[in-house]
Amino acid sequence: MEAARSGIEDVTSPDRISQLPNDLLFRILSLIPVSDAMSTSLLSKRWKSVWKMLPTLVYNENSCSNIGSLGFDQFCGRSLQLHEAPLLKTLTLELRKQTDSLDSSIFPNIHSTLLEFSIKSTGYPVYYSTISFPNNLDVFQTLVVLKLQGNICLDVVDSPVCFQSLKSLYLTCVNFENEESFSKLLSACPVLEDLFLQRLCSVGRFLFSISVPSLQRLTYTKEQAYYSNDEAILEITAPSLKHLNIFDRVGVFSFIEDMPKLVEASVRVKLSKNEKLPKVLTSVEHLSLDLYPSM
């Protein structure tokens, strides 16, 4: 009889998880896919709106197996419409397949104040997700960090300043519709301080015009094991630059203006294409310089 009573007590014991503070519930739900976090709204009245207030959302196409007949972009758009948190610290999209509707199905449905936005595409290299940044969307006004990685092709249209708060921009293996798209993207970031640009894919001859008066840290790298002859030309106008990191065996680099605030530089380039570069770096306090000879 005692065992039976004990069993009844166990079944009817209070729901301790539901009694946890919201901050802890947010941390727990942030560890699982958004689709699973949304399913917790069926547990009880207490859980109905918990997921809607999450400060961090991660959409991974590989883990969204319970979204029914909706496509991944449709699911993201609809769930973002339901999200109610006034502040969204981080939004991450991890794509597996090609999608060209991010700018129409997802961007307009972000209603929270967004601080960090990350898009990663892991699909086949021959399939690029084209992203066109639309005109003056409010979601981009508060963005502080933007990270784009993988098989993404950026097409930046003419628009008013749309990243007026962006401080850090990470572009890893990202292609551009044309050279103007890259320039337009930077011109839309009037307070940009950190630029990380990594090339893993062959884009042929490409001019990267970096003219950002507010830029303080610039990193441009090409993966060490990648030795193709596709040539990048970087024209840099960054009078506020303090930290510089460059590694590219075939690239050509030129500095349009002096950089009087530069205190640290790590440069690994081919000497024959960058003979004037050492003179630009003579006043740097901390310098690491590797000049590769012509082959």
Language-model features and meaning:
Residues S283-M295:
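Oxyanion-binding "anion nests"
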